[in-house]
């Protein structure tokens, strides 16, 4: 294939698509560049589906190479290893909008690999990778209902900004990524600084309008490439099987889906399914058990969806806007710094907040360099929470994604480092799950942070909305169950305060989600959120005035930046001895800020006292109480402050004539001395005889402190 190149303007950036040069054995390959950020995306699809497979095996791998930023990886092996959290999140960002566009019944394995090969620090590669995945699928010939476009939307000074740069984004009140086709939005992922529903909806619409430039360019690019579509046809519907399953199961399934308790309902449905499979096979319908099971699932979907659209009660008897029963408790773990147990129906999260010092911050190694994250939120979804057994180990993609969503929901209300100098880690342990565990994590996180005494700006709650859309109409559902999520058309999660939205995530399985539907969903979500916040406020209305007795207290003092070296000492000897002897953690910034962290208040006071002594300036004419540390023929050296010695000349020991210094002083003597002079070289002249003159003020007592070991 000859190289084919397509360039177009996308907001403030120039985007170039190129194929036909690299990876020519892949089904499709596209190099996408946006102002020097280059992502190489390949697609490989198997021509035949594996026998017996009943699911669509789509894999998306996004990977960053450090050479893209002119760096060599750290670590012993000096090469990239397992995917980072950021890479995992972007893999999900690519996967979510493309997955619904593969036709039902297409079960051939497809793998999308996006590799960042060059990075401009001002241009984030995630949007570039999403555009590349869309372009590669569009020219692959694989059955795909795209292309899609992708856009990042910021909100600055009351205006929407298309694809803000990495330097602009910190000043933006919004970081929203939206993806969709020419006619519909498919995916939204966002974090906001407590914005109104109207602003959030406007951002989605703005992003969808702007991404049309991408969709049009990819269509033109695909036409230039001219790949022939695969010769694939959807499997025919077995009408006889469909009718037989409906005949045998409709009535019983209808009753089963009135059972409110999840475990009992699942057990009942499982028994119905086993009987139906057996009866269908016995009736002579030519299909295997797997196909019968698929048709049984389709019938389940039709029953649940039809009931909702007709205005009948939902699976657990609720109406569309009703929230499940709520239960909130704080301070449930005696030794944790902050804890909360949040229960909504059959979804439950035990959320724990821990306070740490600056050294506990997570060091994140990114393409453009390292950064420290002072707020971490981790989400764990063990198999027991859904009554199952399973492998336990490192977090899976879903857990990483849900944790990040919950973090986005809470981040807007977190205090700055100046307001609260602690590093904070929140862990959400999902102990029960039947829908919307990520939003339970948002609610639990807000409660646990308040219980820990973190001065968050406001309480935050989250709610998951669903949608059932049929030809005869649509219904938006509040606080969806797991089954409603699985059988519905939309997963729409909103987190926020009483004032506005802090996070919005939307995944849509069908085309045709209109602005009207999103508007209704946001309005309904606001009502649900306010209801949940009211219940949460009954448990705890404001952050606790004091942090836990088991949390470290952080005390902050300022010293002269030139004195930092004195506190650290040679090879770190002084600060190491300080931390070991006082039992504190001590951190220093280049501007002279010193943070002392200790659970024991007296230990912190002792560390502060000793640091102040180390960094104190010697004052002329002041009287100090010091210790004799060395004798010489011409006088004695007295330590008056940690690391600071002065000379008492032989003539300044007493009014009488002194022949031998040792006759008057010995090493270890504690004496009063007056500072006569500090010369330009920092040498200190002291006097014992003037310090003992009757008109002088009381002596400043010597301060015991860590001294840097003398050089041998």
From Swiss-Prot:
Residues annotated to bind Mg(2+): 485, 491
A GO BP entry: mRNA catabolic process
Family annotation (CDD domains): KH-I_PNPase, RNase_PH_PNPase_1, RNase_PH_PNPase_2, S1_PNPase
Keyword Lipoprotein: no
Enzyme class: transferase
Keywords from the named record: Cytoplasm, Magnesium, Metal-binding, Nucleotidyltransferase, RNA-binding, Transferase
Domain of life: Bacteria
Ranges of residues in domain S1 motif: 621-689
Recorded GO CC terms: cytosol
Principal subcellular localization: cytoplasm
EC number: 2.7.7.8
GO MF annotations, alphabetized: 3'-5'-RNA exonuclease activity; magnesium ion binding; polyribonucleotide nucleotidyltransferase activity; RNA binding
Catalytic activity: RNA(n+1) + phosphate = RNA(n) + a ribonucleoside 5'-diphosphate
SUPFAM superfamilies: Eukaryotic type KH-domain (KH-domain type I), Nucleic acid-binding proteins, Polynucleotide phosphorylase/guanosine pentaphosphate synthase (PNPase/GPSI), domain 3, Ribonuclease PH domain 2-like, Ribosomal protein S5 domain 2-like
Location(s) in or outside the cell: Cytoplasm
Domain KH: 552-615
Family recorded in the similarity comment: Belongs to the polyribonucleotide nucleotidyltransferase family.
Quaternary structure, from the entry: Component of the RNA degradosome, which is a multiprotein complex involved in RNA processing and mRNA degradation.
Task of the protein: Involved in mRNA degradation. Catalyzes the phosphorolysis of single-stranded polyribonucleotides processively in the 3'- to 5'-direction.
Protein name: Polyribonucleotide nucleotidyltransferase
Organism from which the protein derives: Aeromonas hydrophila subsp. hydrophila (strain ATCC 7966 / DSM 30187 / BCRC 13018 / CCUG 14551 / JCM 1027 / KCTC 2358 / NCIMB 9240 / NCTC 8049)
Gene that encodes it: pnp
């Amino acid at each position: 294939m000859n190289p084919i190149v397509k360039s177009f303007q996308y907001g403030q950036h120039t985007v170039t698509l190129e194929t036909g040069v690299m990876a020519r054995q892949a089904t499709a390959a596209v190099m996408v560049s946006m102002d020097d950020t280059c992502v190489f995306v390949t697609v490989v699809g198997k021509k035949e589906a594996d026998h017996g497979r009943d699911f669509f095996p789509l894999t998306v791998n996004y990977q960053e190479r450090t050479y893209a930023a002119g760096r060599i990886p750290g670590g012993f092996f000096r090469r990239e290893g397992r995917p980072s959290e950021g890479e995992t999140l972007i893999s999900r960002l690519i996967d979510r909008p493309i997955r619904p566009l593969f036709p039902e019944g297409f079960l051939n394995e497809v793998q999308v690999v996006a590799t960042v090969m060059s990075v401009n620090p001002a241009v984030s590669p995630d949007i570039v990778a999403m555009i590349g995945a869309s372009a590669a699928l569009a020219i692959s010939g694989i059955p795909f209902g795209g292309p899609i476009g992708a856009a990042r939307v910021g909100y600055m000074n009351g205006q929407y900004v298309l694809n803000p740069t990495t330097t602009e984004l910190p000043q933006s009140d919004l970081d929203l990524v939206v993806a969709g086709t020419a006619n519909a939005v498919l995916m939204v992922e966002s974090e906001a600084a407590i914005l109104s529903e109207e602003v959030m909806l406007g951002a989605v619409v703005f992003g969808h309008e702007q991404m049309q430039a991408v969709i049009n360019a990819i269509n033109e690019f695909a036409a230039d490439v001219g790949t022939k579509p695969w010769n694939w046809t959807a499997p025919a519907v077995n009408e006889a099987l469909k009718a037989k399953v409906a005949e045998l199961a409709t009535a019983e399934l209808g009753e089963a889906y009135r059972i409110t308790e999840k475990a009992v309902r699942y057990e009942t449905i499982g028994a119905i399914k086993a009987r139906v499979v057996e009866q269908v096979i016995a009736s002579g319908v030519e299909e295997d058990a797997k196909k019968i099971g698929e048709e049984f699932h389709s019938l389940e979907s039709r029953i649940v969806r039809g009931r909702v659209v007709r205005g009948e009660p939902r699976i657990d008897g609720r109406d569309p806007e009703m929230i499940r029963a709520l239960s909130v408790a704080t301070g449930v773990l005696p030794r944790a710094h902050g804890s909360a147990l949040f229960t909504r129906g059959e979804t439950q999260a035990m959320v724990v907040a821990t306070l740490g010092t600056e050294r506990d911050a997570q060091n994140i190694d990114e393409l453009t360099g390292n950064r420290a994250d002072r707020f971490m939120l981790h989400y764990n979804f063990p198999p027991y929470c859904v009554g199952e057994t399973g492998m336990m180990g490192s977090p899976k993609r879903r857990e990483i994604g849900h944790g990040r969503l919950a973090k986005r929901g809470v981040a807007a209300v977190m205090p700055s480092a100046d307001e609260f100098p602690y590093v904070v880690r929140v862990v959400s342990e999902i102990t029960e799950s039947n829908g919307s565990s990520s939003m339970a994590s948002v609610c639990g996180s807000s409660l646990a942070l308040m219980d820990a005494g973190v001065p968050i700006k406001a309480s935050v709650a989250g709610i998951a909305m669903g949608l059932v859309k049929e030809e005869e109409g649509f219904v938006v559902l509040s606080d969806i169950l797991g089954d409603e999520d699985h059988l519905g058309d939309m997963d729409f999660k909103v987190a926020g305060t009483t004032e506005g939205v802090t996070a919005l995530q939307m995944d849509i399985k069908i085309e045709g989600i209109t602005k009207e539907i999103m508007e209704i969903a946001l309005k309904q979500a606001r009502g649900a959120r306010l209801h949940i916040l009211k219940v949460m406020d009954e448990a705890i209305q404001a952050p606790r005035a004091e942090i836990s007795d088991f949390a470290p207290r952080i005390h902050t003092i300022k010293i002269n930046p030139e004195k930092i070296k004195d506190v650290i000492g040679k090879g770190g000897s002084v600060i190491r001895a300080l931390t070991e002897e006082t039992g504190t953690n001590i951190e220093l910034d280049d501007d002279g800020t010193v943070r002392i962290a200790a659970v024991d208040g007296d230990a912190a006071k002792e560390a502060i006292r000793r640091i102040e002594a180390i960094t104190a300036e010697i004052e002329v004419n002041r009287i100090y109480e010091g210790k004799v540390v060395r004798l010489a023929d011409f006088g004695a050296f007295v330590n008056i402050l940690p690391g600071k010695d002065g000379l008492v000349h032989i003539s300044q020991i007493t009014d009488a004539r002194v022949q031998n210094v040792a006759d008057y002083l010995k090493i270890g003597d504690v004496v009063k001395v007056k500072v006569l002079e500090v010369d330009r070289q920092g040498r200190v002249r002291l006097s014992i005889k003037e310090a003992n003159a009757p008109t002088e003020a009381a002596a400043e007592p010597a301060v015991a402190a860590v001294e840097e070991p003398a050089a041998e």
